[in-house]
Amino acid sequence: ADSSENNWLNTKPPLSGWAIWEIFKETKDTAFVVEMIPKLIKYHEWWYKYRDINKNKLCEYGSSDGSLVAAKWESGMDNAIRFDACKIVRGSNYSINTESVDLNSYLAKEKEYLFLIKNYC
């Protein structure tokens, strides 16, 4: 792997569970899915550990360097105007002050995919 390709500023919307489930549906590769389960769980938990400012189970986008532009990148919608009025909340692992509906919808759906993966693979 090329370490210059790593982006430590932010992550992207949580779609890994969906992707793994789609791979499983096509390949029936249970070994691959079983290998991915702990990684999927760790990634899902990461959101609540590092991107839930007030611990109310609703996450916010953010960045590791404290920049608003990197927090916007985390959404996958880099220049979306909906983030223009947002602020970085200091002391919060640099999350923005908005609980985005899309992010929390992705996380809810990820829970469903984790359930499917853990129970059917």
Predicted regions, residues:
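The feature captures the catalytic groove of carbohydrate-active enzymes
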Residues: 2-25, 30-34, 38, 45-121
